[in-house]
Regions:
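Acidic/glycine-enriched connector segments
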Residues: 23, 30-33, 42-116, 131
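Residues at the starts of beta-strands that form the adenosine-phosphate
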Residues: 3, 35, 62, 124
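Structural beta-sheet core signal
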Residues: 5-6, 38, 65, 127
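Generic N-terminal amphipathic, Lys/Arg-enriched alpha-helix
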Residues: 1-16, 26-27, 31-32
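Structural loop-to-beta junction motif characteristic of Rossmann-like glycosyltransferase folds
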Residues: 101-103, 122-125
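Nucleotide-sugar donor-binding patch of glycosyltransferase catalytic domains
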Residues: 124-150
Length: 167
């Protein structure tokens, strides 16, 4: 089972438009029989997990939340498997490592750190360009000379679906 890493803004920074995009994206990911691995909290992570769980294609264990604290109860209600780490923001590396590919939308400092981790381990990031934030800012760029073409700009859910088919 391929795992899609979901990174983006938390509850405070996630606009209604981005949240709705996340729900639709989650529904499409569920239809492709892929699992989600994310930070397990609110905002964009919750939206994608909600879309997965609302899909007729969902299955138990499809949404995995790698939590920053020590309490599984802090996970959003759409997480099937909550993994409390007690590591704070260091859990960002675990999310990136656990995923086969990353989808980034919007994002602040946490998303930036996850994109940087993905770059360092040469993991592809589909950077949604429809919303302001680090995903849009870094789409199509190289962070340094160690790799090329890992931050792939995507302008629609249909483009994301194309990548998921070939994953």
């Amino acid at each position: 089972m391929k795992k899609i890493g979901i990174i983006g803004p938390n509850t405070k920074m996630c606009s209604a438009e981005l949240y709705n995009f996340g729900v639709l994206l989650g529904n499409k990911i569920a239809a492709k029989n892929r699992a989600i691995v994310c930070g397990g909290l609110g905002g964009f992570m919750e939206a994608v997990c909600k879309g997965v769980k609302q899909s007729p294609h969902t299955f138990i264990g499809q949404t995995i939340g790698i939590l920053p604290d020590e309490k599984a109860s802090s996970a959003n209600q759409y997480i099937d498997t909550a993994i409390p780490t007690g590591t704070g923001i260091a859990r960002n590396l675990l999310i990136v490592r656990a995923a086969d590919i990353i989808i980034a939308a919007g994002g602040g400092a946490g998303t930036l750190s996850e994109i940087a981790f993905a770059w360092q381990i040469e993991k592809k990031v589909l950077c949604v360009t429809l919303f302001d934030g680090w995903a849009k800012e870094l789409a199509g760029k190289n962070l340094d000379s160690r790799a090329n073409d890992l931050l792939i700009p995507v302008n629609s859910i249909e483009e994301i679906e194309t990548f998921l088919i070939n994953l």
